[in-house]
């Protein structure tokens, strides 16, 4: 038996109701294109081949998906879902099974697709759902024994059929041999004059194939996106699910409705997240982490007992246990904070390591620097790392004291336990235990008369 699994993803729609120059499948949900959600799910279930059927904006779609290994097939005319799958037949293996998915139905889960595949015993399985309001959706017809006999589209349904509440999601797992057999025989003899993929169900029933049906765990798994309102609604449903998952793991949210998770977040115990916090990319939070209001954390690792005060931005940062950051701190890529460091108001760190117990508390920029343990940066102290062409490194030894409003002009090294006087511009290396002052002498003119304004 051939157990290979192919996915056919229909992604040719223009998405006119989006009022966008971008193809619909490139619209963003949780910081990721709709189509990318589907592709990531396919990767997680070890698909052997993925075929994407594209149409409007095909160049844009292909350029946006270069990180994936895909087979692209163009649908030049949009003549229905059956036609869309039919154009992929030349790329479809003759054996194995195929999942038929949609680029604008982004949230079907890997677990649901795995169950759908397992349910395909006789050649075809499908994802259905019983809903309160089935208007506009294809209805599932069953016989007295509960066997599926047909799918009837809304515009072709009788009054009795329109009363059926079990609907077709359009997501199937079908033996490739059946797709090769049935798709060439589809007809467009219907109200829409389109080639319905649903007609393969009728063909399978006529051949005596028992069609299996399963339901997803969540209704949003089969919800499609056609306009901005639906996109926003689906975003909120997805966010609620992600927040719920973290709550189960012990995270306390000040308001579960005012947080956005746009990636993967792993957590320890007793994490607290205040309002309007955004997580992007891969984020890990240790035990007893507190994140106050308005922070954005992207691709960062946060250790135990870290306190992040309001309105901080982290991007590719590693923060060790016991650190306190903010408010209004900006940690840029390749920032490493060691244990018990403290960053305060309006501090920016870029491509630098701040040693254990060091403090950069006020109005500072530290870039391309290696800062030792126990160092104190006074208010307004900065590293001058860029000469207009190249970046240069600043090294500060353990227990150094950098006075207020100091400029360290890289490349420069400050020795251990060195002291830099306030207001200095340091352009040369400073030895261990030395005091360096690089500023003009104070001049005082007694009885100074200010200039008077000319009349």
UniProtKB/Swiss-Prot annotation:
Write the Enzyme Commission number(s) for this entry. Answer: 2.7.7.23, 2.3.1.157
Instruction: Kindly list the residue ranges recorded as spanning the membrane.
Output: none
Sorted alphabetically, the keyword list is: Acyltransferase, Cell shape, Cell wall biogenesis/degradation, Cytoplasm, Magnesium, Metal-binding, Multifunctional enzyme, Nucleotidyltransferase, Peptidoglycan synthesis, Repeat, Transferase
A Gene Ontology term for the protein's cellular component? membrane
Region Linker: list its residue ranges: 229-249
Q: Known catalysed reaction(s)?
A: alpha-D-glucosamine 1-phosphate + acetyl-CoA = N-acetyl-alpha-D-glucosamine 1-phosphate + CoA + H(+); N-acetyl-alpha-D-glucosamine 1-phosphate + UTP + H(+) = UDP-N-acetyl-alpha-D-glucosamine + diphosphate
Under the heading PROSITE patterns, the entry gives: HEXAPEP_TRANSFERASES (PS00101)
State whether keyword Magnesium applies. Answer: yes
- State where the protein is found: Cytoplasm
- Binding residues for acetyl-CoA: 379, 385-386, 422, 439
InterPro entries, per database record: Bifunctional_GlmU (IPR005882), GlmU-like (IPR050065), GlmU_C_LbH (IPR038009), Hexapep (IPR001451), Hexapep_transf_CS (IPR018357), MobA-like_NTP_Trfase (IPR025877), Nucleotide-diphossugar_trans (IPR029044), Trimer_LpxA-like_sf (IPR011004)
- GO MF term set: glucosamine-1-phosphate N-acetyltransferase activity; magnesium ion binding; UDP-N-acetylglucosamine diphosphorylase activity
Region N-acetyltransferase, as annotated, extends over 250-455
**Top-level EC class:** transferase
Primary site of residence: cytoplasm
Q: Please tell me where Mg(2+) binds in this chain.
A: 104, 226
Ranges for the region named Pyrophosphorylase are: 1-228
Q: Which GO terms describe its biological process?
A: cell morphogenesis; cell wall organization; lipid A biosynthetic process; peptidoglycan biosynthetic process; regulation of cell shape; UDP-N-acetylglucosamine biosynthetic process
Does Transferase appear among the keywords? yes
Q: Tell me the SUPFAM superfamilies matching this sequence.
A: Nucleotide-diphospho-sugar transferases (SSF53448), Trimeric LpxA-like enzymes (SSF51161)
Cofactor(s) for this UniProt protein: Mg(2+)
Similarity field: In the N-terminal section; belongs to the N-acetylglucosamine-1-phosphate uridyltransferase family.
Role of this protein: Catalyzes the last two sequential reactions in the de novo biosynthetic pathway for UDP-N-acetylglucosamine (UDP-GlcNAc). The C-terminal domain catalyzes the transfer of acetyl group from acetyl coenzyme A to glucosamine-1-phosphate (GlcN-1-P) to produce N-acetylglucosamine-1-phosphate (GlcNAc-1-P), which is converted into UDP-GlcNAc by the transfer of uridine 5-monophosphate (from uridine 5-triphosphate), a reaction catalyzed by the N-terminal domain.
Q: What is this protein called?
A: Bifunctional protein GlmU
From what organism does this protein derive? Psychrobacter sp. (strain PRwf-1)
The major lineage groups are: Bacteria, Pseudomonadati, Pseudomonadota, Gammaproteobacteria, Moraxellales
């Amino acid at each position: 038996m051939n157990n290979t699994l192919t996915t056919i993803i229909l992604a040719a729609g223009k998405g006119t109701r989006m009022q966008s120059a971008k193809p619909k499948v490139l619209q963003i949900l949780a910081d990721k294109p709709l189509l990318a959600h589907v592709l990531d799910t396919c990767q997680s279930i070890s698909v052997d081949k993925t075929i994407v059927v594209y149409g409007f904006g095909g160049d844009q779609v292909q350029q946006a998906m270069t990180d994936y290994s895909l087979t692209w097939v163009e649908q030049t005319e949009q003549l229905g879902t059956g036609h869309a799958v039919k154009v992929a037949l030349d790329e479809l293996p003759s054996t194995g099974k195929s999942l038929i998915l949609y680029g604008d139905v982004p949230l079907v889960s890997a677990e649901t697709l795995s169950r759908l595949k397992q349910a395909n015993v006789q050649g075809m399985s499908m994802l259905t759902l019983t809903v309160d309001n089935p208007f506009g959706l294809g209805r599932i017809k069953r016989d007295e024994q509960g066997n599926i006999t047909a799918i009837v589209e809304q515009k072709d349904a009788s009054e009795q059929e329109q009363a059926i509440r079990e609907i077709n999601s359009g997501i199937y797992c079908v033996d490739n041999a059946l797709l090769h057999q049935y798709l060439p025989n589809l007809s467009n003899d219907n109200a829409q004059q389109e080639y319905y993929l649903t007609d393969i169900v009728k063909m399978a029933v006529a051949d005596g194939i028992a069609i299996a049906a399963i339901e997803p765990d969540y209704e949003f798994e089969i919800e499609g996106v056609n306009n901005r309102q639906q996109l926003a609604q689906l975003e909120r449903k997805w966010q609620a699910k992600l927040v719920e998952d973290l709550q189960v793991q012990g995270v306390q949210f000040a308001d579960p409705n005012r947080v956005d998770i746009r990636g993967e977040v792993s957590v320890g115990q007793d994490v607290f997240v205040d309002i309007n916090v955004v997580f992007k990319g891969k984020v890990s939070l240790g035990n007893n982490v507190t994140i106050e209001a308005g922070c954005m954390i992207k691709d960062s690792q946060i250790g135990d007992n870290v306190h992040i005060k309001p309105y901080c931005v982290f991007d590719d940062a590693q923060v060790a246990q016991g650190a306190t950051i903010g408010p209004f701190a900006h940690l840029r890529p390749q920032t490493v904070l060691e244990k018990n460091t403290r960053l305060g108001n309006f501090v920016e760190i870029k491509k630098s390591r701040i040693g254990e117990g060091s403090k950069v508390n006020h109005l500072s920029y530290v870039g391309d620097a290696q800062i030792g343990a126990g160092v104190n940066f006074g208010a307004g102290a900065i590293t001058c790392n860029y000469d207009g062409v190249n970046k240069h490194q600043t090294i500060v030894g353990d227990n150094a004291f950098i006075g207020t409003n100091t400029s360290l002009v890289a490349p420069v090294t400050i020795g251990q336990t060195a002291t830099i006087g306030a207001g200095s511009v340091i352009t040369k290396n400073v030895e261990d235990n030395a005091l360096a002052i690089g500023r003009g002498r104070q001049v005082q003119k007694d009885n100074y008369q200010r200039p008077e304004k000319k009349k």
